[in-house]
Amino acid sequence: MAKYRFGDICEVLNGRAYKQNELLSSGKYPILRVGNFFSSDRWYYSDMELPENKYCDNEDLLFAWSASFGPKIWDGGKVIYHYHIWKLIPNKEIADKFYLYYWLCHSVNRLTAGTHGSVMAHMTKGDMENQQIELPSLQMQKKVSSILRTIDEKIELNNKINNNLEEQALALFKSYFIDYDNFNGQAPDTWEKGVLGDFVEIKRGGSPRPIQNYLSDSGLHWLKISDATCITSPFINEIKEYIIEDGLKKTVFLKAGALVLSNSATPGLPKILDIDTCIHDGWLYFSTSRLSNEYLYLFFKHIREKLVALGNGSVFTNLKTDILKNYPTFLPTNEVLSEFDSIVKPLFEMILATTREIKNLTTLRDTLLPKLMSGELDVSELDV
């Protein structure tokens, strides 16, 4: 392998800094901020015409360098990238773009271990440019990146399958319970009218405090909002943090299969657990319910924007339990609910199976990544 200074084999371009009054609610170009980099949080727009190097487009290599860190091969069309994101342009005669992407994935923890800044941890452009990188031959780089991309492409395909299945389930929910397509366009008189709290018991999780005294490297899973926002599937099957058993006295332990709803940070987000976990007071759960988890999941997805509007405006940090308990709704007859569940449950079962496959593929990729980067796995004889 040959050793290089990162800035000598890859150009690092700064994005554009914006004043708040320049961020529009609609416009010609979306502005890619760090908040949109790892999720689909609220977007801002601009009508400004900028130099071409202030835009990124599909298959551009980007790196978020402030607050949240990491690389991405962009696939969201032409956007303006914010100042806290770099566009990286490799020298194609020396470095393969996709190999650099995986090198950055592998190296991000090391790269950011020495970050500095009084308000937000960040890297500087000089920090990145002065990194040392060892590169095999260009041919070998392309072999390594091809192996990893094959796995990532399968993961992406599975995510698209899941999104399609969920869209089908949401369309069925809308047809049955919003448009009443099977009931002449209106809710039947036989459906019980009331508020959500009449049909579902809503409770809040709990947090042992100070939480730092209970966090551990092993023990009981500790579900955070970030575990939910980092996955598009309805199901959560990976949780990063743990607490010790003493924390059980002041929290709520839920078994796999339970439905939870976020009520802080990113409120109104429903998820179904595929793993046992404790939940803090930023989560709501449903101890008893006359409605299935699948029905409730789709119900919460449908009313999420309305719940936000009932909070402190368009953006709020907490979803009050009373707002949810007093939300007007109805209880369809058992026959209708059984018919609906018989259609959507198989869709959710397929989503769950695919979500588990995604986890296995992710584990495989993350296991191969350091071995391929270090050369521990010799792929020189592979024909890829």
Residue ranges, per PLM feature:
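A short glycine-rich beta-alpha junction/loop motif
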Residues: 79-86, 117-145, 277-283, 313-338
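Sequence-specific dsDNA recognition surfaces
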Residues: 4-22, 27-58, 81, 197-213, ...
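ATP/adenylate-binding site constellation spanning eukaryotic-like Ser/Thr protein kinases
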Residues: 125, 170, 225, 321, ...
